[in-house]
């Protein structure tokens, strides 16, 4: 994996002091159901603002609008801004993990943003037991203990951030937490339709239940996590961790790869049916997993498979959108940043390809900064700014994706 050389610059530019009051504009649905008022372009800084400063400004806006300042969940973040009547005491695990990933980039860039405290709060989502009598991370928290269903993909992205935290903070407890995720996987893998993980422990092998499936997200991100953990795990664990990663990768490659374009379908249901929807992040996870498997095993087919999926991903998802000639999808920016990170994983083996992909992404991000934000400094889901959807734009996950995107670009192109 590429190791970035950081050059933390002094923070130049004017910081916009933005209020979170009345941040969502009144929405008037158009014929398409998700069009509305023209987004207000934020005030342009007097001098060109570097990406690390933009990332910090975005984090500050998230803190102002989403962070909980009192009660049992103080220090956590709300799922939506404004908070909805049916929202939980704190956000679900997925958007919180996305936020921690963004904060990790700020920590790398030299900002003191409470990174360690945020990582440690993962444990408030931990459940020592549920359907499977083994510990794993639940989807919700009351500020002290975990609750909700336990998803295998959620646990994978937590694991990825715990490995990152170990690299940055050097605290061995994060490796202990990763080892527990591996045990959760060992308990969750079965041989139904081939040896792989289900989406959620509550929906294992239930034909007729659409939520009972073995998905690309759980198995792909588990592979990515396992290969990151392999680098730092105790020697006694390495053989089992590598074998599990290879097993999950092979299942995905054999069961959910579209042989026509080397992209990955969404899932295989308990009834054996394939959900053929293709999402950026699923292919991204397999790119990253393939690169790392090649780097560890030396087996060239992993790298060739990663390159094939990467090239098809660019060709399939980068197209003209809303007047922008080359544009990644305008929905689900968290999915997109996972694909982008997989392209960066590939860079040591295909620098020109990664640079091409990054140039388009950086251009999209520049447009988002100019045209795809609210007057609070928060981002719309659609970075072109053409389709405003308050029900989606208000989500913490959208802001976490923007923050991580800015941080990743700052590290890639400081």
Walk through the language-model features, giving the residues of each.
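Oxyanion-binding "anion nests"
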Residues: 279-297, 302-318
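CBM-like carbohydrate-recognition segments
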Residues: 44-102, 106-153, 214, 301, ...
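Bacterial Sec-dependent N-terminal signal peptides
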Residues: 15-53
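Sec-dependent bacterial lipoprotein signal peptides
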Residues: 1-19
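Short coil/turn linking the two alpha-helices of tandem helical-hairpin repeats
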Residues: 107, 166-170, 230-237, 294, ...
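Extended ligand-binding groove/face enriched in aromatic
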Residues: 113-232, 242-246
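Active-site cradle of extracellular carbohydrate-active enzymes
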Residues: 217-229, 238-290
């Amino acid at each position: 994996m590429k190791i970035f050389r950081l050059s933390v610059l002094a923070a130049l530019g004017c910081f916009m002091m933005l209020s979170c009051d009345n941040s969502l504009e009144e929405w008037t649905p158009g014929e398409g159901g998700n069009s509305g008022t023209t987004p207000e372009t934020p005030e342009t800084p007097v001098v060109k603002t570097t990406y690390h400063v933009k990332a910090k400004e975005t984090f500050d806006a998230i803190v102002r609008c989403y962070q909980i300042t009192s009660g049992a969940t103080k220090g956590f973040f709300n799922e939506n801004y404004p908070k909805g009547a049916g929202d939980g005491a704190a956000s679900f695990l997925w958007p919180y993990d996305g936020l921690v990933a963004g904060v990790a980039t700020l920590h790398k860039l030299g900002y003191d943003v409470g990174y360690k405290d945020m990582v440690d709060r993962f444990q408030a989502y931990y459940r020592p037991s549920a359907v499977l009598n083994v510990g794993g991370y639940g989807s919700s928290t009351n500020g002290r203990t975990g609750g909700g269903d336990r998803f295998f993909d959620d646990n994978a992205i937590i694991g990825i951030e715990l490995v990152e935290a170990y690299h940055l903070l050097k605290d061995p407890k994060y490796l202990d937490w990763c080892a527990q995720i591996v045990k959760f996987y060992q308990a969750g893998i079965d041989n139904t339709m081939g040896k792989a993980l289900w989406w959620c422990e509550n929906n294992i092998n239930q034909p007729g239940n659409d939520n009972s499936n073995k998905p690309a997200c759980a198995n792909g991100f588990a592979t990515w996590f396992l290969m990151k953990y392999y680098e730092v795990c105790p020697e006694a664990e390495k053989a089992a961790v590598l074998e599990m990663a290879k097993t999950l990768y092979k299942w995905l490659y054999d069961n959910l790869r579209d042989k026509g374009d080397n992209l990955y379908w969404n899932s295989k249901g308990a009834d054996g049916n394939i959900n053929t929807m293709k999402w950026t992040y699923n292919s991204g996870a397999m790119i990253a997993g393939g690169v790392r498997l090649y780097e560890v095993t030396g087996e060239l087919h992993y790298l060739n498979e990663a390159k094939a999926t990467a090239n098809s991903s660019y060709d399939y998802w980068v197209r003209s959108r809303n007047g922008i000639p080359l544009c990644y999808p305008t929905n689900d920016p968290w999915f997109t940043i996972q694909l982008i990170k997989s392209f960066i994983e590939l860079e040591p083996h295909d620098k020109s390809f990664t640079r091409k992909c990054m140039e388009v992404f950086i251009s999209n991000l520049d447009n988002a900064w100019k045209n795809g934000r609210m007057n609070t400094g928060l981002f719309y889901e659609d970075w072109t700014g053409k389709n405003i959807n308050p029900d989606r734009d208000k989500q913490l996950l959208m802001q976490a994706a923007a923050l991580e995107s800015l941080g990743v670009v700052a590290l890639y192109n400081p």
